[in-house]
């Protein structure tokens, strides 16, 4: 266990470059194409003919590939939040669960595991690691109340999956988040040198951006403080009007003196912009229907 990000397994074992991350994704993509060449047959409602039509979605399309399907990524984000809020689980544990999910799905396909059971297990493990453990039966009961078709009543299924999850994570379970960096940034900005106090509205918006960033790959690529600074810069640009030149100047001076890599900051901002662009097109009915067909192999709700 490491109290410092700089000495942590997160930095030394689970931090990728953009090139190495792309290679990992490509390896999984090729494996999926080999294992599931038949694609997925789904029932689609043809509005013109006003009837149900069965069609095949080739495995080479982006659907159900976690690295390419933003619909799936956003849906996973909502699944974690929904179960977490039912049990009043701390935000830190929920985002740790999301990091576990991202790491796991870098090495395993959604097509070969039960996504709903995976998410339940990620939350169960994250709560133990973040020292806010949940009773396994309570967690499984809540998960079953949300997704009864996909979560088995046998709690040992979660404990079995937990061993599989830990193995894929190589037992590196400590995750450092940008929230602590944000606290340090807030304290530094309020010092006499910068004389800038972040408002409650600014802090809330930065927190929201950090929360949403877990839907992207930035936590596999960059240090927590870089993500926190990127979200600070984004909120500063949104909130402060051109006439607030002093406030912008103080924040820009702070960012410059941190010597953070501005290319990384720009990439994180681009990832967030791309995420929100896809969020506007989010189609929950479609992804739910695809997963229903994938896991249950029976009549599915029509995809609108």
From Swiss-Prot:
Annotated GO biological process:
regulation of transcription by RNA polymerase II
- The protein's predominant localisation is nucleus
What keywords were assigned to this record? Activator, Cyclin, Nucleus, Repressor, Transcription, Transcription regulation
Q: Which residues form a coiled coil?
A: none
Q: What GO terms fall under cellular component here?
A: nucleus
* Localization, UniProt: Nucleus
The Swiss-Prot or TrEMBL record annotates one GO molecular function as: cyclin-dependent protein serine/threonine kinase regulator activity
Domain named Cyclin N-terminal: which ranges?
43-174
Q: Which domain of life does the UniProt lineage start with?
A: Eukaryota
What's this chain's function? Answer: Component of the SRB8-11 complex. The SRB8-11 complex is a regulatory module of the Mediator complex which is itself involved in regulation of basal and activated RNA polymerase II-dependent transcription. The SRB8-11 complex may be involved in the transcriptional repression of a subset of genes regulated by Mediator. It may inhibit the association of the Mediator complex with RNA polymerase II to form the holoenzyme complex. The SRB8-11 complex phosphorylates the C-terminal domain (CTD) of the largest subunit of RNA polymerase II.
UniProt similarity note: Belongs to the cyclin family. Cyclin C subfamily.
UniProt subunit comment: Component of the SRB8-11 complex, a regulatory module of the Mediator complex.
Q: What is this protein called?
A: RNA polymerase II holoenzyme cyclin-like subunit
Give me the gene this protein comes from.
SSN8
